[in-house]
Amino acid sequence: MSKSKSLAFVIAALSYSFFSLFSSPPKSHYHELFISTSFSDNASVALNLHTLTRRPHVAGTVANAEAAEYVRSVFTSSALKSHVVAYQVSLTYPVHRSLVLTPTDSAKPITFLLEQEKLGDNPYANEVMPTFHGYAKSGNVSGPVVYANYGRVEDFVRLKKDMGVNVSGAVVIARYGQIYRGDIVKNAYEAGAVGVVIYTDKRDYGGDEWFPASKWMPPSGVQVGTVYNGLGDPTTPGWASVDGCERLSDEAVELSGDVPLIPSLPVSAADAEVILKTVVGDVSDGDVYPVGPGPGVLNLSYIGETVIAKIENVIGVIEGEEEPDRYVILGNHRDAWTFGAVDPNSGTAVLMEIAQRLDKLQKRGWKPRRTIILCNWDAEEYGLIGSTEWVEENREMLSSRAVAYLNVDCAVSGPGFHASATPQLDELIKVAAQEVRDPDNATQTIYESWIGSSDSVVIRRLGGGGSDYASFVQHVGVPGVDMSFGRGYPVYHSMYDDFTWMEKFGDPMFQRHVAMASVLGLVALRLADEEIIPFNYTSYALELKKSAEDLENEKLGHNIDVSTLIKSIEDLSTAAKHISLEKEAIKGALKVRELNDRLMMAERALTDRDGLSERPWYKHLIYGPSKYDDYGSKSFPGVDDAIDNAKKLNTKASWENVQHQIWRVSRAIRHASLVLKGELI
C-alpha cells in the first residue's frame, strides 16, 4: 500500500470514529430518556399542582390570570418560546340566586341557603364563587315539583306516556350522572317546564363517609357547570372573539338555540332530599322517588350578569428542525369552577411536566423533526371557549399543517388508564402504553394492566363534546387523543376538588401524574420525530366496518341501503394496506413528505363544509356528539340524527333523508381513500 493510500485510510478511519463519537444519537434514545425515572419529578408535579390550585380560578378572574402567568413562566423557563393569546369573550356570573320550597299550601316556606359547607382548613374557601350554571337564563319562576330522574329524553317520555304526568308549568328536579346538564335543561324546556333544579344524588356520588374522610361528595356538595349547548363564545359563532370583532346581540344568541330559555340552578344532595320529600305520586320502575307533580312548589329566582371578559391562552413552542411547518399540538385547560385539582389542573401539571422534560431533552441535544406546540386553554368550563376561539382564528393554518392534537383534561382522578382517540392513533397509544410502567403496579406496564382490566384494550372515540379536542377533531378534522387515569370522580365541579382531595385520594404519591406525562409525551415525541407519521388507517377501516355493521343490524327497512357505505369502507381498507406497503419501499425526502401529507390530510377528508344538519359547526361526519347528550359520542352522527327524526315523523321525506346522510358519509370515506392513495380521478 502506498503512503498516500495509507494516509487516506487513516484519515477516513479517524473521521468515522469522530463522527460516531460526536454525532447525535437516534431519536429513540431521547424517547427512552424522556420516560426514564431520571427525567421525571414527582415533587415538581406536586408543587405545580399545589400552586395552581391554591385559589379558585374561574375564567375571567384575576386569580385565573395569575395562574396563566405561572404557566407561562414555567413554559419560558423550560426553553419554550412562550406567549399569551387573549380573547374578549362573553361570560356570565351570578348576581342573585334564590330557591324557596313551599311543601304544602299550609306549610311554612323553606328558603335554601344554596351553600357548600366549608370543610377542612382551606384558607381560600371563601373565594369560591356562589353555585350557579354558566349561561343560565335569568328569571323568576314558580311551579309544582316534578322529578325527572336523569332528565333524559326517555325520562320525559316515560313521565308523559307511561305515567300520565304533565310537566307543563312545573319546576323539574333531575339528577346528574347520565347526560350533559345543558341537555337536561333543554329537555325540560321542550317538555314544558318553567325551571330546572339539578342535584348530585347520593346513589351516584355519595358514600357512607365523605370528604375529607373519604373520596365521596359531602351532602352539601354542589356540582356547578355550564348549560350552554354550543362551543366557543356564544356571540361569535364561527369566528374568533378578537378586539373589535362582529358580535351577535343577546336576542340573536337566544334565537340560536344554544343557550337555555328557562332558568336553572344546581343544588346539593341535602337540599334535593328536602325537596323530594314534598313530592308524591307514582314511582318510576327502578327508581325510589315519586315523580309528582307536587304538592311541593318551588320558586326559583336567578339573575346573572353577562360581561365581555378577557381570557388568556398560554402557548409554548419548540420549533421543528426539519419540518417546522408541521404541528404536533398538546393541550389542556387551566380555568376551573373552584380549585380544580382534578379538573383541570391535574392535566395542567402533566403538561408542565412534559414541558420540563422536553427542556431536559433539548439540553442533551435533541431537536424535534416537527414543531411541538403546548397549549394551556382558558374558559373551557364555559363551553370550550379558549380552544375554540384559537382554532377558529387559526382554522386554515391548522387544516393544512396540524399533524395531531393530544388532549389531557382530568388527567388523574384515580387508578386505571383510559384513552379515547381517532382510530389511526390506536396502535401508537398501545405501543406507548407498553413502554411505561403502571404507577399502581410496578411489575406491569400500563398496557398490561389496561388489557387485564377488561380482557381487551378499549379505546373510546372522540365524538362527545366534553373537552378541548372537540374543535380540532369535530370542526377541522385533526386526528386527536384524550387520556386519563381514572374515569369520573365524586367531587367533580364542587369546592371539594382541591389539592387535599388529590393528595389523599386521587394520587397520593403523584406517580399517576408522572406516568400520564410519560405516555402522552411519548405519543407526542413519536408523532414529532418519526420520519413517517405513525398513523394506521387499517385500524380506522376496521372501526368504521364495526359501525357500519351496527347500522346494518338496525334493520331500518324503508329501502335503506348501506351497501355504498360498506363499499367505501372496503376502499379505505385497501388504501390503508397500500400505504403500509408504500412505507417499506419509500425513498427520498420529497416522497416522504408527500406520503406524510396524505396521512395527515386523510382525516380532513372525513369532514364536510356544510357540517351536520341543524348543527353546521360540527363538520366531522364520522364522529360527533349525540344530539341529545353533548357528552355522548356517536359514530355517523348525521345518520343517527336523521334516523331519530325519521322514527318520530315516519314520512317518506324523513326516511329519504336517512339515505341521503348515509350517502354523505360514504362520499366522505371515499374521499379519504383517494387522499390516502394520492390519486386524482
From Swiss-Prot:
Residue sites binding Zn(2+) 2 per the record: 343, 381, 493
Catalytic activity: Release of an unsubstituted, C-terminal glutamyl residue, typically from Ac-Asp-Glu or folylpoly-gamma-glutamates
Its EC number(s): 3.4.17.21
Regions of this protein lying in the Extracellular compartment: 25-681
Cofactor binding: number and manner: Binds 2 Zn(2+) ions per subunit.
Localisation per UniProt entry: Endoplasmic reticulum membrane
Pfam families named in the record: PA, Peptidase_M28, TFR_dimer
Active site positions, chain numbering: 380 (nucleophile)
Cellular component GO terms held in the UniProt record: endoplasmic reticulum; endoplasmic reticulum membrane; vacuole
Record-listed Zn(2+) 1 binding positions: 333, 343, 409
Keyword Protease among record annotations: yes
Class of the enzyme per the UniProt entry, highest EC level: hydrolase
Topology within the bilayer: Single-pass type II membrane protein
Cofactor(s) annotated in UniProt: Zn(2+)
Residue ranges, Cytoplasmic side: 1-6
Swiss-Prot/TrEMBL keywords: Developmental protein, Endoplasmic reticulum, Glycoprotein, Growth regulation, Hydrolase, Membrane, Metal-binding, Metalloprotease, Protease, Signal-anchor, Transmembrane, Transmembrane helix, Zinc
Transmembrane helix is among the record's keywords: yes
GO molecular function: metal ion binding; metallocarboxypeptidase activity
Glycosylated residues (UniProt): 42, 140, 166, 299, 441, 536
PANTHER family: N-ACETYLATED-ALPHA-LINKED ACIDIC DIPEPTIDASE, VACUOLAR PROTEIN SORTING-ASSOCIATED PROTEIN 70
Function of the protein: Acts in association with AMP1 to suppress ectopic stem cell niche formation in the shoot apical meristem (SAM) independently of cytokinin signaling pathway.
Family: Belongs to the peptidase M28 family. M28B subfamily.
Protein name (database record): Probable glutamate carboxypeptidase LAMP1
Source species taxonomy: Eukaryota, Viridiplantae, Streptophyta, Embryophyta, Tracheophyta
